[in-house]
UniProtKB/Swiss-Prot annotation:
CDD domains: AAA (cd00009), Bac_DnaA_C (cd06571)
SUPFAM superfamilies to which the protein is assigned, alphabetical: P-loop containing nucleoside triphosphate hydrolases, TrpR-like
Protein's organism: Prochlorococcus marinus (strain AS9601)
Domain of life: Bacteria
Chain segments carrying region Domain III, AAA+ region: 124-340
Region (Domain I, interacts with DnaA modulators): 1-79
GO cellular component: cytoplasm; plasma membrane
The protein's name: Chromosomal replication initiator protein DnaA
Disulfide bonds: none
Family: Belongs to the DnaA family.
MF GO annotations: ATP binding; ATP hydrolysis activity; DNA replication origin binding; lipid binding
Annotated spans, Disordered: 84-121
């Protein structure tokens, strides 16, 4: 296989001008030249999935560009690196209109039109979650390619698209990027992003108010539905029943369904087998934790987006320290920048490292500091915090306060109980266990705890 070829290089340059950047970078750039003989251009795709998608959606576009450059008809065939024989024939090419080629006529001005689409912002699409902000690595390449394929040609081959992976790896980002890209291509598209919790609450509300007809219209009258955290359907029998019929209605109408979960369909528990079967009938793409190179690239891209300048050794330190997920990685970046900005300390590994300790407050603080900071953060009075109130906002703040006092001071459990109005040491132990349990499953709690830790760090260092 030749490393380069002037004909293919010119074709790529031509396509780069006519295709969107995500499409070009995902499908065209990775394709390698194999040979060009007797008007037959053979290209090598990274895998069978890519070669199939190129053949069905870009073959005609590539042939047209090659003809303009060569001055005669050119036929294109695709092979994959994992399969050296030619992939599927081109016999269906004439019947498969190139959806992507048709939709490229939409200019960037459609961004203004799409903002008028009632299904965009009202349905929770975060403007930051777009394809151009997603860093693709070996851990996410297949999921990214599948997401882009669905965004370009919804309701066709990968329906449903089931994206799975651990917490904070980019599932929600990819899902919402599909929605944004689809609306950019087709401003009239009805796109809806919803969490499973919201869907469940809507079903419950519909039952109570005898309004299920309106709920069904809300979820079934869409072109593209993006459903996050489907694992939370576990044990909810009536909601599962309603979702089963919603899924069927959408699928039968040709609407695209995209589902995200923290595990693949065959590992979901407490969910009806008929739903599991439907989740598995399309394509399942998983996202793994990013490797060091990808984590470094993510931090560099975030620094560029935020117009921040971080020393390379600090970026490498953060990338090497936070390995489990992207949310944690970006959170560390944000804390480092905020800490340096507020304290005036230099952006060095030595000054930032204590702040990034994920297991402790990092400096010794007083019980009064913890109580005051927790009180300020949750907007509850210190009297309420140390009272016996069982109101959820107060009890949750109290539990977090006990957890932080345990990890930020040298007080024993009974002493911590005394600081919180004379609580028994078993109450303190229970509170700490509850917070530790929630830290691994509730991103909101984890974020709250980390923010208070950071505030305690900053206050303590100001007093040094």
């Amino acid at each position: 296989m030749q490393a380069t070829n002037p004909i293919w290089a010119e074709v790529q340059q031509s396509l780069q001008k006519t295709l969107s950047k995500p499409s070009f970078e995902t499908w065209i750039r990775p394709a390698k030249f194999n040979c060009f003989e007797n008007g037959l251009l053979t290209l090598i795709a990274p895998n069978t999935f890519s070669s199939d998608w190129l053949r069905k959606n870009y073959c005609e576009t590539i042939e047209k560009a090659a003809k303009e450059i060569c001055g005669h008809d050119v036929k294109v065939v695709f092979k994959s690196e994992t399969n050296t024989s030619s992939d599927l024939s081109n016999e269906d090419k004439a019947n498969e209109k190139n959806v992507h080629h048709k939709t490229r006529s939409f200019s960037s001005n459609n961004q203004n039109n799409s903002s008028k689409n009632q299904f965009k912002n009202p349905n929770g699409l975060n403007l930051r979650y777009v394809f151009k902000r997603f860093v693709v690595g070996p851990n996410s390449r297949l999921a990214h390619a599948a997401a882009l394929a669905v965004a370009e040609s919804p309701g066709r081959e990968f329906n449903p698209l089931f994206i799975c992976g651990g917490v904070g790896l980019g599932k929600t980002h990819l899902m919402q990027a599909i929605g944004h890209y689809r609306v950019e291509i087709d401003p009239e598209a009805k796109v809806k992003y919803v969490s499973t919790e919201t869907f469940t609450n809507d079903v419950i509300s519909g039952i109570r108010r005898d309004g299920m007809t309106a709920i069904r219209d809300k979820y079934r009258n869409v072109d593209l539905i993006l459903i996050d955290d489907i694992q939370f359907l576990e044990g909810k029998e009536y909601t599962q029943e309603e979702f089963f019929h919603t899924f069927n209605a959408l699928h039968e109408s040709g609407s695209q369904i995209v589902i995200a979960s923290d595990r693949p369909p065959n590992q979901l528990s407490g969910i009806q087998e008929r739903l599991i079967s439907r989740f598995s009938m399309g394509m399942t793409a998983d996202i793994q934790p990013p490797d060091l190179e990808t984590r470094t690239a993510i931090l560099q891209k975030k620094a560029e987006q935020e117009r921040m300048s971080l020393p390379r050794d600090l970026i490498q330190f953060i990338a090497g320290r936070f390995t489990s997920n992207i949310r944690e990685l970006e959170g560390a970046f944000t804390r480092a920048v905020a800490f340096a900005s507020i304290t005036g300390l230099p952006m060095t590994v030595q000054s930032i490292a204590p702040m990034l300790d994920p297991n402790s407050v990092g400096v010794v603080v007083t019980p009064k500091q913890v109580i005051n900071k927790v009180s300020d953060f949750f907007k509850v009075s210190t009297d309420e915090l140390i009272s016996s109130s069982r109101r959820k906002p107060v009890s949750q703040a109290r539990q977090i306060g006990m957890y932080l006092m345990r990890h930020g001071t040298d007080l024993s459990l009974p002493r911590i109980g005394d600081e919180f109005g004379g609580k028994d040491h078993t109450t303190v132990m229970y509170a700490i266990e509850q917070v530790e349990k929630k830290l691994s499953i509730d991103p909101n709690i984890a974020s709250q705890v980390q923010k208070i830790r950071d505030l305690l760090q900053i206050d303590s260092r100001k007093n040094l």
